[in-house]
Amino acid sequence: MKKSIALVLSIVLLAALFAVPASAGEQNTIRVIVSVDKAKFNPHEVLGIGGHIVYQFKLIPAVVVDVPANAVGKLKKMPGVEKVEFDHQAVLLGKPSWLGGGSTQPAQTIPWGIERVKAPSVWSITDGSVSVIQVAVLDTGVDYDHPDLAANIAWCVSTLRGKVSTKLRDCADQNGHGTHVIGTIAALNNDIGVVGVAPGVQIYSVRVLDARGSGSYSDIAIGIEQAILGPDGVADKDGDGIIAGDPDDDAAEVISMSLGGPADDSYLYDMIIQAYNAGIVIVAASGNEGAPSPSYPAAYPEVIAVGAIDSNDNIASFSNRQPEVSAPGVDILSTYPDDSYETLMGTSMATPHVSGVVALIQAAYYQKYGKILPVGTFDDISKNTVRGILHITADDLGPTGWDADYGYGVVRAALAVQAALG
């Protein structure tokens, strides 16, 4: 088995200093996100200034628009337009993570990170294989026929360039990062390769980044909306006010984002709020800059920011400080395209460990009580919410309680599931 080590945040979104062209052939056309008053906004008026609607959000009052650069002022003055925000380019820092690998399937090994979060001792209770529990992974897509993943890929969708597509070719991972992240969450317990934290959980692969690890903030916001709507495209189909954890709905119960950046765009936050209010636990990488605080979207209070540790329980030097919790993120072995396996490191790799633990908590709780736990808040220290359970059961390696290096500590699946079950 070939192993390659790469430092990956995986994907840090940098706010561009200028608007990104809508396409290479339309250098005078830019993409913007328009927050609107739906009662007053007329989408057809956009055509009158030479623009067109790329995507109309269902869950927030906003639209993605391609418009001539010299018409932005006119757009801002249209009835019903409340705010116009320029889209931001997303880039992968460092070399592309297409490292290749052999197709020979090795005998299964349990990666050190899976052991460190104490996942194997939970599998006799649950491996995450509860029909109402799905984890949406917003990333570069997935190798959907990888023998260590295929059985757990329940749905894939791409939102690249504002176009929603469920065609397999559009969902395919041409970078490797997404396949690696998904393997840490849900690689099968099948005697080959590796095994994930929750080896039975269903995965929604939401491709928001292209082969270069490049995408946009608007693509990510659309991806979050798709995770809420689910394969049937309808949030709260039965109208009972319950979305996550409802067997009549197919929204994800967990959203995992191994990406981040410095820009705080209001429409992205609005979509985060929609997911949080739907009862979805949102987990994101804190960042790889060694900065004193997390990047966005991890910095939002509704999101669990994840820092990275190495196998000696040291905080990785690259890991941004002030995470909510920490998890293994150095020398992480997982699945990779072409039926292979690779070793990567970054807060990107720490994040899926936490997402997998959350999936185990919710699966175990649902099996016993027929419902899922509320998400909770950053300050929770009770057994009544997912975040509270993560906090009180974490391995508190720094000063007692929360600290700026480890957060509440390193997540532990076994104690977390025990706490959830009472």
UniProtKB/Swiss-Prot annotation:
EC class: hydrolase
This protein's UniProt keywords: Calcium, Hydrolase, Protease, Secreted, Serine protease, Signal, Zymogen
Residue positions assigned to the propeptide: 25-106
Gene3D superfamilies in UniProt: Peptidase S8 propeptide/proteinase inhibitor I9 (3.30.70.80), Peptidase S8/S53 domain (3.40.50.200)
Domain of life of the native organism: Archaea
Molecular function via GO: identical protein binding; serine-type endopeptidase activity
Temperature dependency: Thermostable. Highly active at 80 degrees Celsius.
Gene Ontology biological process terms, A to Z: proteolysis
All copies of domain Peptidase S8, residue ranges: 111-417
Cofactor(s) the protein requires to work: Ca(2+)
Subcellular localization, as worded in the UniProt entry: Secreted
Activity-pH behavior: Optimum pH is 9.5.
Signal peptide, first to last residue: 1-24
Record SUPFAM superfamilies: Protease propeptides/inhibitors (SSF54897), Subtilisin-like (SSF52743)
Annotated TM spans: none
Catalytic site: D139, H177, S348
E.C. numbers: 3.4.21.-
Family, as annotated: Belongs to the peptidase S8 family.
Subunit structure: Monomer.
Identification of the protein by name: Tk-subtilisin
Species the sequence originates in: Thermococcus kodakarensis (strain ATCC BAA-918 / JCM 12380 / KOD1) (Pyrococcus kodakaraensis (strain KOD1))
Organism phylogeny: Archaea, Methanobacteriati, Methanobacteriota, Thermococci, Thermococcales
